[in-house]
């Protein structure tokens, strides 16, 4: 991994798809109309998940998933070199077929998968009013510097922020893929803490690829309201997700917070349910939450925290977004 630049202002079903409850295909949405049309290309080897099981699409681009009792979404691991305006589908009663369209785009990849992305966190807005300047700066920088994607690691903030943030910063208007994590202040009143987040941003854990790296989005464990998901939910999905990743491929984990103060990165759900992320070639853990500008090495991986974009950090760091570069080794 290259030095980062601060700019101011992981059991069950880990094989090829087999017969199951949910089916569909992953295709290249050439005309961008959001539906599969005759003649459009399907894609082999794309990961699709029901939030527990993870399978790869077949040679014909098709998948089949069994579903599970805690299912809410079907979602894909968006492949490198493609973007999608929706990487997930909320599961509807009586509907069993779900297709996923992806669109090619220029991720500015190097010959060995090198690329860069932009990290923001803790924007904590209540309205889109007054946010125009930093959103514009971020968009322009992403374009000028050839960012592969933008990641927001949570604390979009309460009902107002959750409802207003995505319309002002999304894959369409930023012209690069935009991904979101859930933070503690994004767990709000509802049937369960992430209900509103899910209705706007989709699943709270998922993955995507860019260049030579596999990126994993994970949720905050707690917050202002109790979440419906558990560590066990994330553990089982993550284990199945990582089982599909080629050995040695670099991984980066995104979360709102940082989970260790030691030199090992172990995802633990208790009762022996542990995943050694370092054994999966973890390169970095990228987070926010504490509102500081901080980079340190824990073992073989970097811990990278970026201060808030609109207000700066509690450590007196300037308001910032961060450019992170991945070299040929991740």
Language-model region placement:
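Sec-dependent signal peptide recognition
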Residues: 1-9
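Beta-strand-rich domain onsets/edges
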Residues: 12-22
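N-terminal active-site segment of His-dependent metallophosphoesterases
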Residues: 21-22, 30, 92-164
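Short, acidic Ser/Thr/Gly-rich low-complexity loop/linker segments typical of extracellular
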Residues: 30, 34-36, 42, 49-62
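Short Pro-Gly-centered beta-turn/loop motif in secreted/extracellular proteins
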Residues: 42, 64-73
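A short, solvent-exposed loop/turn motif at the edges and junctions
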Residues: 50, 71-91
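Extended active-site neighborhood of metal-dependent phosphoesterases/phosphodiesterases
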Residues: 80, 162-250, 271-284, 292-327
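Active-site glycine-centered loops adjacent to acidic/histidine catalytic or metal-binding residues
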Residues: 122, 154-155, 183-184, 256, ...
